[in-house]
């Protein structure tokens, strides 16, 4: 077991009625001196497992499907989809390890998408209601599930209606925009205004059908479904000489 040394200083105790800090017995002046204290410590640390909840849309709501606009513009210029570069931080995700090792696999793109969304939504103050009041746990306001036939995305947007959300596909970039404005008036002629907005841009993999993207908003939860296309692998035998 190792020890750490803590260096600190101690001063004489002064009480009421004491005129000076000089000892009456030996007439010597008391001074402050440093001393050392050793505390044993262990290098072992305990990490608490992170809890993860998934939001589900339940009940009836007037919000239905959200229109998805697709636009292609490959004539000159680069793609205007912007990437956000901040510290990487990932949450739990079921990803095949082969997809992470294969540089040509679409799962590599999906991993980048999740990292981007995690950085975009790491500020939980953007939209309220990200904490479970019953357990006090904080859940991610987004989720992605990669199936064999489609990619499913979930975004929590409490307080936003269908008219305040826009989903579009620009070339190979999925664009999600939301804007919410609300004015409140109180007593004594006081009033306030709430405003929240965001613009998310995600690069889509090559093995998806960008013309058949579907979006639906229910109970403040945006659900996006992107069907996959079948990619035939071309195999060519190489003669060994």
UniProtKB/Swiss-Prot annotation:
Disulfide bonds: none annotated. It is found in: Plastid, Chloroplast. SUPFAM superfamilies: HSP20-like chaperones. PROSITE patterns: SHSP. GO terms for cellular component: chloroplast. The keyword GTP-binding does not apply. Belongs to the small heat shock protein (HSP20) family. This is Small heat shock protein, chloroplastic. It comes from Petunia hybrida (Petunia). The gene is HSP22.
């Amino acid at each position: 077991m190792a020890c750490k040394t803590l260096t600190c200083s101690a001063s004489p105790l002064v009480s009421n009625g004491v005129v000076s800090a000089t000892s009456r017995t030996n007439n010597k002046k008391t001074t402050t001196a440093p001393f050392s204290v050793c505390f044993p410590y262990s290098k072992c640390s305990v990490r608490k497992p992170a809890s993860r909840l998934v939001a589900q849309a339940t009940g009836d709501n007037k919000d239905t499907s959200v229109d998805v606009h697709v636009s292609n513009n490959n004539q000159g210029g680069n793609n205007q989809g912007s990437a956000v570069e901040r510290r990487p931080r990932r949450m739990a995700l079921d990803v095949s390890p082969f997809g992470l090792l294969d540089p040509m696999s679409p799962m590599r793109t999906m991993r980048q998408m999740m990292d981007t969304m995690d950085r975009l939504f790491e500020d939980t103050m953007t939209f309220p209601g990200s904490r479970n009041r019953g357990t006090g746990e904080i859940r991610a306001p987004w989720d992605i599930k990669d199936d064999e036939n489609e990619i499913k995305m979930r975004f929590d947007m409490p307080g936003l209606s269908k008219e305040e959300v826009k989903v579009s596909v620009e070339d190979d970039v999925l664009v999600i925009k939301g804007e919410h404005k609300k004015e409140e008036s109180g007593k004594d002629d006081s009033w306030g205004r709430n405003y929240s907005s965001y613009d998310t841009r995600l690069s889509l993999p090559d093995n998806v059908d960008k013309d058949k993207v579907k979006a639906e908003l229910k109970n403040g939860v945006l659900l996006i479904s992107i069907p996959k296309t079948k990619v035939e692998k071309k195999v060519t035998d190489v003669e060994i000489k």
